Amino acid sequence: MHNDFGNAVNEYFVREFRRLYKERKARINALKTPEAVLEYAKQAQKRIRELFDLEKLPRTPLNPKVTGSHTYKYYTKQNIIFESLPGYYVTANLYLPSDMTGPVPAVLHLCGHNQDAKSCTNGVSFNVGTAANGIAVLSFDPVCQGERFLHFMENEKNLCGAHNTIGKELLLYGEHFPAWRAWDALRAVDLLCEMPEIDSSKIMLTGCSGGGTMTTWVNALEDRLIASAPSCAVTLWRRTVENENPIDAEQLPPDLAGEGYDMADFLIASLPRPILVSGEVNDFFDVRGQQEVGREMEMLSSIVNAPIKSTFFTGPHPHALQREQREAIRAFFFKASGVTPRGICEDDIPRPATEEKLAAPDGDVFKIPGNRSALTIMKERCNAVISARKALSKAELAQVLKKCLALPGDIPVPEDYRRLPLHIFREGTEDIINRYLIENEERMLCVLNALTGTADYQVPQCKEAVLYLPDVECIEMETLPEEFYKGKILFGIDTFGVGNMIPTSCGVSSRKPGDFYGAYWHFAGLSVMLGKSFPGLQMEGILAALKLLKAQGTENVTLIGRGYGAILGTYTALLAEDMVEKTILLDAPCAFEELVGTYNTFSFAGILPNILKYADWLDIAKAVNAEFR
């Protein structure tokens, strides 16, 4: 079928993020006094901490164990295992300066997306160079990386795919991956504060790429830091959207973009703490955004008369913790901590061998007795949420579904529509699919397809109709047995991201709904950041089309949903029960509950955040008496 509106989804998000950027910029430029800036910072910090909601979790014993220690010229290194949650083991390396005469400042170095994690070459170079010159460094393996790899992806060491699988599943029952990742970092700060070798009044934070993202988030969550330096991560969300750059699950904090915040607000939240916004000129995290945030931090830091001013640094290389950045961050931290570096050049410092950095048996936390994986903890938490659910009436179920979908309060009857070129239903027949584009002032909503034997230049009118919601595109209607619609007009809806509106964004090789970095992943993530849901954006089009049919006299609809369309069909049957007389579901997916804690390729675009707090989609199907075939 024609893909006439492949850019419609992308352009909607570009417009939204540009609007939000412009509004936020005006608010920032209006901050002229220290009091105004600090009040803005206070409110940003409050909202961010509410969203991450980590203070509710108990600070259980860390139970740290040193499993190995090595001495090198200029520094020593300890291999450590600690528990950020009971039985949830974190593997770490602590680098300490040689010839210590007392507690020293420390840097918590958060790892980016590298399978070697705490053992990656550039990161280790930063760690040994910093420790040799007088400041300790603690670096740990994130979940699914290094010694904490999760063996659940068909033996494929795809750490980003593992992160994104966990990320989409957490949303179903009300958690999110940025908070999940931040918890390990907060507990690592706890660990540093317990160490007699560390001056707990002088803890600093850095990380590159995904570690730079986590540095940005944790900066707003942690009061015990004296300086932060996110690397190769900070930009403007507008730039990410404009550049069609899908980002990782930990880079998608829910709601905040829609509330007018941006990445910079996680840095502003800690003012007057000094921040170095670091990056590289040829970075896929747009350097224009990095530098604009850096200038913004310089301006606000000056307004509040910060003792050490925030600033930014841009290296000449592609995305990575390159040498110039390492040196700039290191110099920034020595200034912030008041430590005089010992003048030892990074090139002259020996690096540990790979096996010398392993903390767990054979470098695998799953060989530690009693280890609990992230998947196990997720499943336990999800089950607890499900067990706490209350029975809901059909009307109550409709209300919570609207809430999770983030639907607007009222979806009006479309005032107009466009008549599109015809499509021949089956080659060799005279059956014609008439196509109509329904839109509102914000965006294109859906393409309504109508199978008739003639060219209909207006949406055909009928009292009874069959409505088909496809898995991928309405061309699937060609395979639908005639018995489903005989004697009635068969309508089909290509809603947002479906059929005529399948995205052509984010590269030609990334258009499968289950891709970890495809267009569907990208737009689902942006929806979450805006406080919306991609299924909600899709449902708005479906419900608008039904309103149009109802206004033209349609009274009864038999609804047929296939594959992912079965889920949307279930939502439709509940929210348009005044029209939907019968619901038939073909090739229906599994329950959402069954996804949690498993490897799966269910599309992020089909994930409905928070729904498992109230019901599963199969519970809704039961409530509308859906027929499964």
What are these regions (language model features)?
Residues 1-89, 102, 119, 271, ...:
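Alpha/beta-hydrolase-fold serine-hydrolase catalytic core, especially in secreted/extracellular enzymes
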Residues 101-186, 191-194, 234-246, 250-252, ...:
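Cap/lid segment of the alpha/beta-hydrolase catalytic domain
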Residues 114-125, 157-161, 172-183, 205-216, ...:
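Alpha-helix capping and helix-loop boundary segments enriched in small/acidic/polar residues
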Residues 137-141, 226, 276-279, 490-493, ...:
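Short hydrophobic alpha-helical runs that function as membrane-insertion/retention elements
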Residues 141, 206, 231-232, 278, ...:
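Alpha/beta-hydrolase-fold catalytic nucleophile elbow
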Residues 188-259, 545-614, 619, 623:
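Primarily recognizes the serine-hydrolase "nucleophile elbow" in alpha/beta-hydrolase
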